[in-house]
Amino acid sequence: MMKEKSQVMDIDRSIYDIKDVENDTYRIKSGLTPEIIEKISKEKNDPIWMQQFRLQALQIYNEIPTPDWGPSLEGLDMDNIATYVRPNTKMQNNWKNVPQDIKDTFERLGIPQAERKSLAGVGAQYDSELVYHNVRSEVAQEGVVYMDIESAMKGEYADMVRKYFMKLVTPRDHKFAALHGAVWSGGSFVYVPKGVQLSIPLQSYFRLNAKGAGQFEHTLIIVDEGASLHFIEGCSAPKYNVANLHAGCVELYVKKNAKLRYSTIENWSKNMYNLNTKRAIVEEGGTIEWVSGSFGSHIGCLYPMSILKGDNSKMEFTGVTFAGSGQNLDTGAKVVHVGKNTSSFMNTRSISKSGGISTFRSSVVVEKSAKKAKSSVSCQSLMLDSESRSDTIPAMDIRTKDAAIGHEAKIGSISGDSVFYLMSRGMTEEDARALIVSGFADNVSKELPVEYAVEMNNLIRLEMKGSIG
């Protein structure tokens, strides 16, 4: 029996596939050795404790095996990855001072416009270093700290960075956490003081331009008691015919009665291995909200984790994944209930077409101490043709009888009746299908600020654009 072919073409990535001429100040040789780690540390003028941390992380990396579950990582050879590439500029706090070639790339991606319209602060990283970082004066006056993490580590906030850095995600967590600990570079540090509630978001944008390189930024956010923050992360890269790697790390500390929303729109190119690690710990009465849109990369392994440590703490995860030709996106979320009366809710959508593979993994752990915990997991999958694949892999470890846990999963395809109805109202078949898919992913887009919801819906329309039949 002949397989049904996808009726849509792959994404038109022209805006994201801008390839700048590589004009780097320094590119370390490919591979992973103690000598390379020492060179990175020297280039970055690390404090002594960080030099030692990097070398210890490398040792752990060499001890830990590559994961034997999930998508195959055989195409990723660290001997061919340059782990540090410094662009041709120092970090600027005035957009006018950013070199024109780098500025042109970010301007095409809409970063300056977004800052002017709707953001309290912006960080822009190009390859291994931040090239721009700025925060509105009225936000800084409230005591909010938003700066590159390396300046924080060497300056006024050195003790705070050292206290929290890779304590939530340790190098021993898994092989790529250890890799991150050895070669990390760039990223942001955020501290929101007690009681400060930011009404507009902060954003960091990560752009990997260098061919055959890796990006390993570290984001550390501390939202103090009674404070609130919305942080947005965006990512993109041009496509090359060799593997690129993204293995960043995000550590989020949500204090008593604080609230943090962490939103991500990832549109890496389809030669990218995206092996990011994100984790939050939530104190009494605190709330962590994850909003995630994954549209790019060749291989993706993304499972944000939340530890609900305090009583009455909450977690919500809302995500959409779109896997097209040549993509294997293995995503999901994890939660550990520790405190009493804690609650978690996962609501995800996955879309696959043209032979794409999407896998949703959920992990719910309820400790004995987590009396009256509540957890609900919902995953819906939409396959646009018979070439594609969608899997749901739930895992639950419930150690108390005093908990309410639920899980549901649905897999389906686009209804011909729905397409016919929309076409009878004047739509083309292509537009009808795109509208249905956009509606399917509405759980994420409605949670984003309008500018980012528009970007996400544009990505969906681009994925669906193409000839019919």
Regions found by a protein language model. Name each.
Residues 1-5, 468-469:
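Short, Lys/Arg-enriched, disordered terminal segments
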Residues 18-22, 44:
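Non-catalytic terminal regions with compositionally biased, polar/charged low complexity
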Residues 12-16, 340:
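Extended intrinsically disordered or low-complexity segments
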Residues 17-19, 34-38, 397-398:
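Short acidic (Asp/Glu) and glycine-rich catalytic loops that position anionic groups and cofactors
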